[in-house]
Amino acid sequence: MKNLVLLGGGYGNMRILLRLLPNNFPEDTVITLVDRTPFHSLKTEFYALAAGTSTDKQVRVDFPEHPRLKKVYGEISSIDREEKCVYLEDGTTIPYDDLVIGLGCEDDYHGVPGAEEHTLSIQTIAKSRVTFEKLCGLPPGSIVAIVGAGLSGIELASELRESRSDLQIKLFDRSPRILRAFPEKLSNYVKE
């Protein structure tokens, strides 16, 4: 049997699983999904978790079930492409015939001094929880600065306005307008 190993249970590898399972799964293949957590996280909804308008349960989706789908939970320590093996921090070795790496992204502070130490994040469920707790502890009238006026920044600002209308929310972006990846007409509408 061939072993297709999927590193990461994010959107890309979930799409692969949902396309293959249950009807397009080659008979000679098993799939091993490796992730830190036993569920898929709806990362595009973390802003609502941070703002307190959504719960952990609402941003989690169970991985699909299939007799030839094995789920392994842990941290990846290395990949040996010559030996075709993935190594986990707990010592587990996972051989593969084909490998898909879909491990997601991390916050990028663009070299801004102090940004990592003095900002909060919504990149993971755990970081979104911390952000929520900090926001809950702010007294009325506090200023919340959101760095990044793309979709996540705008969504977070909107949800915060709903859950904490007593806060002053300021958006900062390096672009002269919000939602720079979208048509200017939409950007202007959202700004108003």
Where are these regions (language model features)?
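Glutamate identity and glutamate-enriched acidic tracts
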Residues: E27, E45, E65, E75, ...
